[in-house]
Amino acid sequence: KPDFTKERKKTEREKEWLSRKEYNPFLWKAWLLMGRSQFYKGSFDEAASTFSYMIRLYKTQPSIAQRAKAWLAKCYIEQGWLYDAEEIISEMKRDSVHWRAQKEWNYTLTDYYIRAKNYDLAAVYLRKVIKTEMRRLQKAREWYLLGQLYESLNQKENAFNAYKQVVKLNPPYHVEFNARIAMSEV
């Protein structure tokens, strides 16, 4: 813990900084990377414990803690524990989401509502995900998924427009081919 020997009264920002348990400004990225690697490896219990530890460790820094909460909810969703994921999501909705954690939450909410078969809300959050996505191939995949969601909701025109967006993004051949086939089926 760093020394703080100023004689004056501490500001709120200084109090928050001194109440932290971790002072390395880049270590949270290592924790997040470790949890994500465990998640993608399929070790959801290990990933959930890593993200739970991150939430406790960085509780004074909302942007980091909320990212970890989003990934913890993803772990629960992948394990089929929708009730636990819903508990985290309702807690998140009660509090305001930090703008730096918004993208992770949109991904998580999209995944949750797809698993819960609430396709209307999934489409709303998937639209938000598409707005923030920078990678062209990933954006094409998300538009394709949005087209599939609209198809399952019997919104044929919206599905057609979503598949048309996939073709506009000039994705790899197999993605474009599947989008054109889906356009002809709608």
Model feature map: region roles:
Residues 1-186:
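Acidic, polar-rich low-complexity tracts and alpha-helical solenoid repeat scaffolds
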